[in-house]
Amino acid sequence: MRVDVVSIFPEYFAPLDLSLIGRARASGTLQLAVHDLRTWTHDVHRTVDDTPYGGGPGMVMRPEPWGEALEALAPPGGNPPRLLVPTPAGAPFTQALAHELAAEPHLLFACGRYEGIDQRVLEHAASRMPVTEVSLGDYVLFGGEVAVLVILEAVTRLLPGVLGNVGSLDDESHAHGLLEAPMYTKPAVWRGQEVPTVLRSGDHGKIARWRRDEALARTVARRPDMIAALPPECLDPRDRAALERAGFPDPPEGVAK
């Protein structure tokens, strides 16, 4: 996968040389380049922002450097990348979107600052490449750099060969619309607290059922919206019983009791 990131703070992305992302870069699985937006400015002050039309606080990122940057990194006539723009006004970033992005051959990230990027940049870009405005959540950051770090980590770990054990992707939180069950390791007893007996039983069927029930209960307690969004056909009668024990008020309809 090729990834280009444009920012006025390219140093922000130094952590992408570390850990599994660093290995993915070293192996060529992830071809990542970070670019300084000010490269595409032409005045002595390397200006990238100006006051907003209509008044109001803050500054807005000017369209000229962004237009040149996008044309340089995604030349007209070539295979267009998918442009990702982190913004509080974007659609929520989800694990499903991470999987979608992991299937793209080329991603281009535009890191906004101040009050954001002049809207004309995104409208013009949309005429020649897919544009996705994305938000990490209902809060505001100083800029898009932190969001890009999060999105890149979520996407890179889904690329083939990045994780040593691909089975790790199957049972983690959000993989099947649920939060992951609690996890334990050695020792069996720590400060008087024991690992649940079923996990030490060696009975794989019972262990799988316990983890499923715990995942359902944890999701009910912390993210009932995820339970409400589950397709009825993905729940069997034992799942429904677990939801009732967990106190979910209205399990999804359509599953035989």
UniProtKB/Swiss-Prot annotation:
Entry-linked PANTHER family: TRNA (GUANINE-N(1)-)-METHYLTRANSFERASE (PTHR46417:SF1)
Gene3D superfamilies in the record: 3.40.1280.10, tRNA(m1g37)methyltransferase, domain 2
EC code(s) of this entry: 2.1.1.228
A Pfam family reported for this protein in Swiss-Prot or TrEMBL: tRNA_m1G_MT
Organism: Salinispora tropica (strain ATCC BAA-916 / DSM 44818 / JCM 13857 / NBRC 105044 / CNB-440)
Any coiled-coil regions, as ranges: none
Described purpose of this protein according to its UniProt entry: Specifically methylates guanosine-37 in various tRNAs.
Complexes and interactors: Homodimer.
Protein family (similarity comment): Belongs to the RNA methyltransferase TrmD family.
Protein name (database record): tRNA (guanine-N(1)-)-methyltransferase
Gene Ontology terms describing biological process: tRNA N1-guanine methylation
